[in-house]
């Protein structure tokens, strides 16, 4: 599949978009994707992430060849619930799925 975009490239693209197009909203941003990201692929910080109680938005990148289904979303929300209750990070103000094929109803 020559020219195909891979998961990591998709996350880099989304992070670059955040830097170029959303820097007024997010003075800090970070790409965390991969194993150990705790359900956070790309993060836009509205306030300093080194200060307790910081404000942030999550961008969950999903490069599937089909629409995101309910089971895909549930897994990611499960991670969010687990890691926020565990105190790994505060609840994000907004949570976005960034996917090329929208969401399905199943």
Where are these regions (language model features)?
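Mixed-charge (Asp/Glu-Lys/Arg
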Residues: 1-38, 43-106
């Amino acid at each position: 599949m020559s020219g195909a975009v891979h998961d990591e490239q998709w996350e880099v693209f989304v992070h670059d978009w955040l830097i170029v197009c959303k820097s007024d909203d997010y003075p800090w941003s970070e790409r965390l994707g991969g194993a150990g990201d705790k359900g956070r692929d790309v993060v836009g910080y509205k306030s300093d992430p080194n200060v307790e109680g910081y404000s942030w938005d999550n961008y969950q990148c999903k490069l599937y060849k089909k629409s995101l289904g309910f089971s895909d979303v549930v897994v990611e929300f499960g991670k969010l619930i687990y890691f926020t209750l565990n105190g790994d990070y505060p609840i994000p103000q907004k949570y976005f799925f960034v996917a090329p094929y929208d969401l399905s109803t199943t």
